[in-house]
């Protein structure tokens, strides 16, 4: 008598979706960010095999665009930049940009290059340092990779600004 029964009873018909957009009819997510964080995880803990597997999984779920959030932060960078090395940045142990572009090409994806962040804007509020550095970064990256890989899709401007931004 009433034991073991849930009240009120739910019938199969009551479990229909109440979604505004019908299932499998919404906008698909086809792009994602590669969070290089060049002085932290994941890239220092992952080799090319792990990245390849990640790209395989992304491709399998419909990702066709990968965007590297930034190409470097302060003295850490994702590729061997002649310009940034002269400015005191550290030589990376792996050329992540080349690896990402090769994997993007292998899985028929487009890769977008996130610009360099010197950290000076965060220290001073003056954006002109970032603009000047990235003029050189863009030119050298295009020569090193843009002309070489069909997967190179363009640029991602990763800088953050506010009404108080100078420069």
PLM features: residue spans?
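N-terminal Sec signal peptide cleavage junction
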Residues: 1-3
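Active-site groove signature of glycoside hydrolases
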Residues: 116-122, 138-166
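Acidic, His- and aromatic-enriched active-site or binding-groove loops in soluble protein domains
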Residues: 97, 131-142
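A cross-domain feature marking catalytic cores of carbohydrate-active enzymes
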Residues: 33-36, 70, 113-117, 156-159
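Short, well-ordered coil/turn segments that N-cap beta-strands
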Residues: 25-30, 62-64, 107-111, 149-153
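Boundary/entry segment of secreted carbohydrate-active catalytic domains
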Residues: 7-64, 69-72
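The substrate-binding groove and active-site-proximal loops of carbohydrate-active enzymes
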Residues: 35-48, 80-92, 122-132, 158-166
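Aromatic-lined substrate-binding rim segments of carbohydrate-active enzymes
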Residues: 48-60, 64-118, 167
